[in-house]
Amino acid sequence: MAKKKAFTPLLYFASIVFLPWWISLSFTKSMESWVTNWWNTGQSEIFLNDIQEKSILERFIELEEILLLDEMIKEHSETRLQKLGIGIHKETIQLIKIQNEDRIHTILHLSTNIISFVILSGYSIFGNEELVILNSLAQEFLYNLSDTVKAFSILLLTDLCIGFHSPRGWELMIGSVYKDFGFVHNDQMISGLVSTFPVILDTLLKYWIFRYLNRVSPSLVVIYHSMND
């Protein structure tokens, strides 16, 4: 009976982790063709913001310069000039197709994120009992660990999140979140978040160590500072 009570929260935790991902993946696979067809037939204009327009314009100018340089190196003839115009036209269409596909993927990502949020909200509303059991199991597991293991785990986690090499990881993660939620890649915004978010986390961690760990387990704080030094 005790094993069954322990197994139910673990099964619940597994469903929290994998069910939103599985439903989102199934939704993406089943709705991709419909969204693509709707977007290609229902949209008569291409919607671009300033960042997207600047990016496409820069790529187009770069492409045009490369093709012109290629033609300058080769023989000048009317046929080659016609081929140059055809090449620019084809590459322009390709750029528009890529932008169109990015917009479709943005719609799909945004839809799947909304679905995942709704599912997780349902878990938090209707699964209070299971969440309480999971919380108690997690606290019991952490309580049984030695202070050395706890200090090492905290140090490892902080080095991964706010260590010397963490900005690159934060940049990739924030860029991925930007893409998933349909935002356009913005280097300035991402750089600002990368430079401020780890600092905020570091401040919160120090506050937590000072207010909570000093009161609950002073020996853990001593071991943590010894390892950190």
From Swiss-Prot:
Location (main, coarse): plastid
Gene: cemA
InterPro entries to which the protein is assigned, alphabetical: CemA
GO biological process, one term: potassium ion transport
Gene Ontology molecular function terms on file: antiporter activity; proton transmembrane transporter activity
Plastid in keyword set: yes
GO cellular component: chloroplast inner membrane
Upper lineage: Eukaryota, Viridiplantae, Streptophyta, Embryophyta, Tracheophyta
Membrane topology note: Multi-pass membrane protein
Functional note: Contributes to K(+)/H(+) antiport activity by supporting proton efflux to control proton extrusion and homeostasis in chloroplasts in a light-dependent manner to modulate photosynthesis. Prevents excessive induction of non-photochemical quenching (NPQ) under continuous-light conditions. Indirectly promotes efficient inorganic carbon uptake into chloroplasts.
Catalytic activity: K(+)(in) + H(+)(out) = K(+)(out) + H(+)(in)
Protein name (database record): Potassium/proton antiporter CemA
Residue intervals passing through the bilayer: 7-27, 114-134, 190-210
Family that this chain belongs to: Belongs to the CemA family.
Keywords noted in UniProt: Antiport, Chloroplast, Hydrogen ion transport, Ion transport, Membrane, Plastid, Plastid inner membrane, Potassium, Potassium transport, Transmembrane, Transmembrane helix, Transport
PANTHER family: CHLOROPLAST ENVELOPE MEMBRANE PROTEIN, CHLOROPLAST ENVELOPE MEMBRANE PROTEIN-RELATED
Subcellular location: Plastid, Chloroplast inner membrane
